[in-house]
């Protein structure tokens, strides 16, 4: 059996997108991993499954699977690719759509210039909702933000914790490019204080409206861009009094613009979405790959 797929990226964060409306799909984690494998599959940071929603107040549902096969709550770059996918395939003619994801409802708008704006919802800071178990960790307050300290590779990492539908721990570094993200990232990601693991962000402040960011994503490793990570970093910087909205976030994959009006307000993310190529998966071969 053959299954059509579309390869896309949002600022270098790449996805395999599957139309679960045309063909119902129920893959195992092993099969998702096989598709995401860059040697034996198509290759992707994450995979997006487009489905119809059973809710009358939304247009679509989509599910997000990490490179390791695990399903996750939200993905900002994936949301932008999702909008382009359903628009290009003629599944909707709306400029603004409402979609259901694991953690709630998102509103997505295709701009006239092809950029996509995503209403990412209001950030959450309560530790229990990330979840985050700080116990007796050292703390400090900067502006409206409370940070907690972890000892990572002999360095003190002061972390701002925020959920953008998925958990993030953000620290400010002097030089994002030189920082050992691939060494410290996995230690933060899997630290015991984060029971469901965490996305680790490393933010360099350029000026009050611009940062450089690298993110070690939960279940995916370092990626070229992370939309929810960009939102979390901008929010953390604004709460700490280091940044003002809007914030230009420069990643290895490109730039995103993040706007946030403050406590209780939604975070608005604007950025590109690009189709790279289309193809077909051989499901029989995929099952064999997944079995090994």
From Swiss-Prot:
The keyword Ribosomal protein does not apply. Substrate binds at residues 13, 46, 66, 76-77, 166, 199, 217-218, 227-228. The keyword Cytoplasm applies. One of its GO terms (biological process) is lysine biosynthetic process via diaminopimelate. Pfam families: DAP_epimerase (PF01678). Pathway: Amino-acid biosynthesis; L-lysine biosynthesis via DAP pathway; DL-2,6-diaminopimelate from LL-2,6-diaminopimelate: step 1/1. It is an enzyme of class 5 (isomerase). It is found in: Cytoplasm. Its EC number is 5.1.1.7. The record marks 168, 217 as: Could be important to modulate the pK values of the two catalytic cysteine residues. InterPro entries: DAP_epimerase_AS (IPR018510), DAP_epimerase_DapF (IPR001653). PROSITE patterns: DAP_EPIMERASE (PS01326). GO terms for molecular function: diaminopimelate epimerase activity. Keywords: Amino-acid biosynthesis, Cytoplasm, Isomerase, Lysine biosynthesis. GO terms for cellular component: cytosol. It catalyses: (2S,6S)-2,6-diaminopimelate = meso-2,6-diaminopimelate. The active site is at 75 (proton donor), 226 (proton acceptor). Homodimer. PANTHER family: DIAMINOPIMELATE EPIMERASE, DIAMINOPIMELATE EPIMERASE, CHLOROPLASTIC. Catalyzes the stereoinversion of LL-2,6-diaminopimelate (L,L-DAP) to meso-diaminopimelate (meso-DAP), a precursor of L-lysine and an essential component of the bacterial peptidoglycan. Belongs to the diaminopimelate epimerase family. This is Diaminopimelate epimerase.
């Amino acid at each position: 059996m053959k299954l059509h797929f579309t390869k896309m990226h949002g600022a270098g964060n790449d996805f395999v997108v599957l139309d679960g409306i045309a063909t119902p799909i129920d893959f195992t984690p092993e099969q998702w991993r096989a598709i995401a494998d860059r040697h034996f599959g198509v290759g992707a940071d994450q995979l997006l499954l487009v489905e119809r929603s059973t809710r009358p107040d939304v247009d679509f549902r989509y599910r997000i699977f990490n490179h390791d096969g695990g399903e996750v709550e939200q993905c900002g770059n994936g949301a932008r690719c999702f909008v382009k996918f359903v628009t290009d395939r003629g599944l909707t003619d709306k400029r603004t759509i409402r979609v259901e994801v694991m953690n709630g409802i998102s509103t997505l708008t295709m701009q006239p210039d092809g950029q996509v704006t995503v209403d990412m919802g209001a950030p959450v800071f309560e530790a229990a909702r990330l979840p985050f178990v700080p116990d007796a960790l050292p703390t400090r307050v900067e502006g409206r933000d409370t940070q907690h300290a972890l000892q990572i590779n002999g360095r003190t990492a002061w972390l701002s914790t925020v959920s953008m539908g998925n958990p993030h721990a953000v620290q400010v570094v002097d030089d994002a490019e030189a920082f050992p993200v691939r060494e410290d990232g996995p230690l933060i990601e899997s630290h015991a204080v984060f029971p469901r693991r965490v996305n680790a962000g490393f933010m360099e402040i350029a000026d009050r409206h611009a940062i450089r960011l690298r993110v070690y994503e939960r279940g995916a490793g370092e990626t070229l861009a992370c939309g929810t990570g960009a939102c979390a970093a901008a929010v953390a910087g604004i709460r700490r009094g280091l940044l003002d909205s809007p914030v230009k976030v420069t990643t290895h994959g490109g730039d995103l613009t993040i706007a946030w009006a403050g406590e209780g307000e939604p975070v608005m993310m604007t950025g590109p979405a690009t189709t790279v190529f289309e193809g077909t998966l051989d499901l029989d071969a995929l099952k064999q790959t997944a079995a090994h």
